Amino acid sequence: MLRLLLLPLFLFTLSMCMGQTFQYSRGWTNGKRSFNAASPLLTTGHLHRGSELGLSDLYDLQEWTSDRRLERCLSQLQRSLIARNCVPGSDFNANRVDPDPESSAHPRLGNINNENVLYSSANVPTRHRQSNELLEELSAAGGASAEPNVFGKH
């Protein structure tokens, strides 16, 4: 009697586990099983919760757009860092005008940050002035330092 009860229960449990494994291996979750591009009201006349765009899909869409924005920002930062570090003799200014761009080893690197507000040539004197003011304040507050030329190295 006990075997007759346990055998169907075991088979049912096994089939449920196999079904869930199949669904998740195909990427099917509760919000993504069925997505109809047409409006659910137009196709059936009734609003079915299973065929509308779920909240999890909206969050995925927002994550995708923010990921694209973050990727674009990081690639712009990477290009600016490459432009600053790869050009020999650069004064940390990627906007300087090269007299002969065809003879330069890196013709594109001089114009990478023209549209970037943070690294525009208008901000360069302000940035140097701020760092010099900080250096003067630190040297005035610290008095005689054990390493007097720490900030001059950078």
Swiss-Prot record:
Species, as recorded: Drosophila erecta
Residues spanning the signal sequence: 1-19
Modified residues annotated as Asparagine amide in this record: N30
Function as written in the Swiss-Prot or TrEMBL entry: Cardioactive peptide. Corazonin is probably involved in the physiological regulation of the heart beat. Clock (Clk) and cycle (cyc) proteins negatively regulate Crz transcription in a cell-specific manner.
Tissue expression: Expression is restricted to 24 neurons in the larval CNS (8 in the brain and 16 in the ventral nerve cord) and 12-16 neurons in the pars lateralis of the adult brain.
GO CC annotation: extracellular region; extracellular space
Molecular function in Gene Ontology: corazonin receptor binding; neuropeptide hormone activity
Positions bearing Pyrrolidone carboxylic acid: Q20
Prosequence residues removed at maturation: 70-154
Pfam family, one: Corazonin
Name of the protein this chain belongs to: Pro-corazonin
KW Ion transport (keyword) present: no
Nucleotide-binding recorded as keyword: no
